[in-house]
Amino acid sequence: MTSSLHRPFRVPWLLWAVLLVSTTAASQNQERLCAFKDPYQQDLGIGESRISHENGTILCSKGSTCYGLWEKSKGDINLVKQGCWSHIGDPQECHYEECVVTTTPPSIQNGTYRFCCCSTDLCNVNFTENFPPPDTTPLSPPHSFNRDETIIIALASVSVLAVLIVALCFGYRMLTGDRKQGLHSMNMMEAAAAEPSLDLDNLKLLELIGRGRYGAVYKGSLDERPVAVKVFSFANRQNFINEKNIYRVPLMEHDNIARFIVGDERLTADGRMEYLLVMEYYPNGSLCKYLSLHTSDWVSSCRLAHSVTRGLAYLHTELPRGDHYKPAISHRDLNSRNVLVKNDGACVISDFGLSMRLTGNRLVRPGEEDNAAISEVGTIRYMAPEVLEGAVNLRDCESALKQVDMYALGLIYWEVFMRCTDLFPGESVPDYQMAFQTEVGNHPTFEDMQVLVSREKQRPKFPEAWKENSLAVRSLKETIEDCWDQDAEARLTAQCAEERMAELMMIWERNKSVSPTVNPMSTAMQNERNLSHNRRVPKIGPYPDYSSSSYIEDSIHHTDSIVKNISSEHSMSSTPLTIGEKNRNSINYERQQAQARIPSPETSVTSLSTNTTTTNTTGLTPSTGMTTISEMPYPDETHLHATNVAQSIGPTPVCLQLTEEDLETNKLDPKEVDKNLKESSDENLMEHSLKQFSGPDPLSSTSSSLLYPLIKLAVEVTGQQDFTQAANGQACLIPDVPPAQIYPLPKQQNLPKRPTSLPLNTKNSTKEPRLKFGNKHKSNLKQVETGVAKMNTINAAEPHVVTVTMNGVAGRSHNVNSHAATTQYANGAVPAGQAANIVAHRSQEMLQNQFIGEDTRLNINSSPDEHEPLLRREQQAGHDEGVLDRLVDRRERPLEGGRTNSNNNNSNPCSEQDILTQGVTSTAADPGPSKPRRAQRPNSLDLSATNILDGSSIQIGESTQDGKSGSGEKIKRRVKTPYSLKRWRPSTWVISTEPLDCEVNNNGSDRAVHSKSSTAVYLAEGGTATTTVSKDIGMNCL
């Protein structure tokens, strides 16, 4: 019973207790009257006769006792149940006459229930509490066991976790070395780095070099070695620590970073603490001081700028190498005072008091908190716009601070090259000025720089001398502007700027013979090309030497035409070309030689050059003889001189139908010309660059191309040149050359680049034969500068030089005397009396050789020199017109006294049968009334045809033209309009030297008119020859 009292009270137990009482009542010898209350009205087998509901009692069976159950909560006692209690166990448990609670209340309902039993009648009406106070720490054995187990498990988990954390921290430090994310000093290797073992007691401060914001710099002596000592006060201790730590970063040694020796601290005589940084001594001092005392040439200036850039690029580079790691470093105070100059002319970067180590988006700078401001530091004059505005990109600190350094580097570039002597040719170099010194003076304020740099977006001004169109100067200006760009993201990186500075030095190396600045009308590409063939003959003759950069103003006046020439090459060789040398500027050379033999325009006579040029090639290339004939007033005033009669097997005259207009000129589209006029010098420079690298140089010694100008067919010769005697009444003779010595002309491919000459095409006879230029005879070629051709109207009449060339054989890798004889004449005479039967078979063989293949066709897709004009300088028209007037008079009147007609009208006319044997058909022009008129110079380089009779014969149209005569201009450059090589006429080349009218002859005349002076050039057994066309017959014989 005792154990049951100690157990927690539950309602089912009470029911079982009542059941037990009821079941054992029968065993009791005495009936007991007890108080009764049962709210649940459970039927426990008690008869209704025993329960008295009026007074709430029950008559218990014998052996039963009374019990009561109360609930005590919040000071109130509520009766739960009363009745008879029949128990099994010790009867002494309920031997009390009163209902006394002697046991501790059970834990049911937090100990609020009270139970008692007694053995007298109605003893259970009330109850009495009589039990000891409960224990303050009563713990049941199961609960104590669970608590101890929880404590043990928690302690073990914490211990294991602590061990893991310690192991991870140790492993992280071992793997990353001195790296740490954050702003605090954590570099284990750096902290463990040993200072150089130097005794600072031997350090002596000799003289003060300079003083800055954070200390003074002295020249000192350490162990009898000159050193520079930077002294910091106690107030600037943080700058000392930071600069010392930057110098001690692993892999910090570099040629363009100041060499650090040792850093230490000491007490002064008055007890103050000072900090010393001992560094290598640089006698030239800072870059600012050096530039104020010295000027430099282009190479030295590039060396200064390149070395600073190289040092900054190394600072900005993150460099892991083995066990060492160098983070990227931002200087943050880069200016010309913090750059030192070494004895070899290179620079080193110093003063790292404000520098930061950069690790991604975080910074490493000892002594600063995470929210430390990284803006508004450094020298105000060199602050970038974003720093002045307080708009540094804190999300990408690494890139932002590098861009700040690049802005300052651009200002240093400007300071360095403002003292470059090569950039100020012909004038004194300006005194040294710091950046923005002209705008804000020597002591600018923060607000001044904000207004100037951030709001007004101004930068230091480039001088007028830097406005020249030079590749070097232009690249320099672009580099500087890309460094100090207003947009920080658009600035160059230090590595890119280093490459650009190296390229500037390479440009100078390639252009040693010229200054980096050139004349305005010259392009950098012309400088490059002029260097490859700078051997020029001296200027000879009455006319100035026009270089490739010359251009011609558009003019319709006769003698008021203005020719501007600004040479991009200031130095010329004083040694003339001799035999055996290859002159690449052949057109210019020919013109100079011709001018040298002309005393004046008024007394021009025919002269023959005796100087020849030879070409050494590595392959078998055709060799052609070349000579120059200038204008001849008249045969009776002077005579033709010839030397070295050609050695030929059997000279044979050749008779061919003289034709003109096998070539057709593609006229320029005015829209295309306008487009060319609008092109800037930048596009011209790019065009020249692309042209240079798009194909091989046609003038190189290894090129197999033979290039022919359109007006003067000038080619180069190998070996000794011979000339035949040409006099009045003597025909032009062509020597017989053995077929074994004839080699086909090389094939000239149509390279995909800008053509350098006019194309070939045959005009349809149904089309209009000429292009109308209008009343003022203006050319459709407009003025174009630098790289675009210009053509003026040409009104003055003048006989043009005719070059007669013949191919010989050039041996491999050595010179061979050519067997080809070349005879040249201008409006010369050809005698009659040549045998027609010899002409027939000789001309037939020549025409067959022309149709062999493409390799035998001469290509005129390019000229011998892309720098030189297509036309020679025109002679003054005063005396020449008089000469041509006499020529016209002689053409119009019959022969007198057997004298040969100067225009070959009656010189050995060939029979029609001879002409048909060559496959060439001629149609005689109907005679018409002859009207004497004055010959005039053509308005443009026009080779269009008037009438086409068949595939091999073309009649030359002629019409009258009115206009004033005047001196013409020459074409200095090719027009950029693309030409196409449409079709070859393999039978003949016809290049007219007689001007054709600017208006179309549409007067309905049946007479086929001819040019008074034309030249037909044709191939004959691998050679070339020229002759003139007759006005009456339209053909002539050689």
UniProtKB/Swiss-Prot annotation:
Glycosylation sites: 55, 110, 126
One Gene Ontology MF term: protein tyrosine kinase binding
Keyword Transcription attached: no
Record region (Disordered): 593-626, 746-769, 872-974
SS bonds (residue pairs): 34-66, 60-84, 94-117, 99-116, 118-123
Cofactor names: Mg(2+); Mn(2+)
Membrane topology: Single-pass type I membrane protein
Transmembrane segments: 151-171
Biological processes, Gene Ontology terms: anterior/posterior pattern specification; aortic valve development; artery development; atrial septum morphogenesis; blood vessel remodeling; BMP signaling pathway; cellular response to starvation; chondrocyte development
Modification Phosphothreonine, positions: 379
Catalytic activity reported: L-threonyl-[receptor-protein] + ATP = O-phospho-L-threonyl-[receptor-protein] + ADP + H(+); L-seryl-[receptor-protein] + ATP = O-phospho-L-seryl-[receptor-protein] + ADP + H(+)
Signal sequence annotation: 1-26
Residue ranges, compositional bias (Polar residues): 909-924, 937-964
Family listed: Belongs to the protein kinase superfamily. TKL Ser/Thr protein kinase family. TGFB receptor subfamily.
The protein's name in its UniProt record: Bone morphogenetic protein receptor type-2
Organism annotation: Mus musculus
Name of encoding gene: Bmpr2
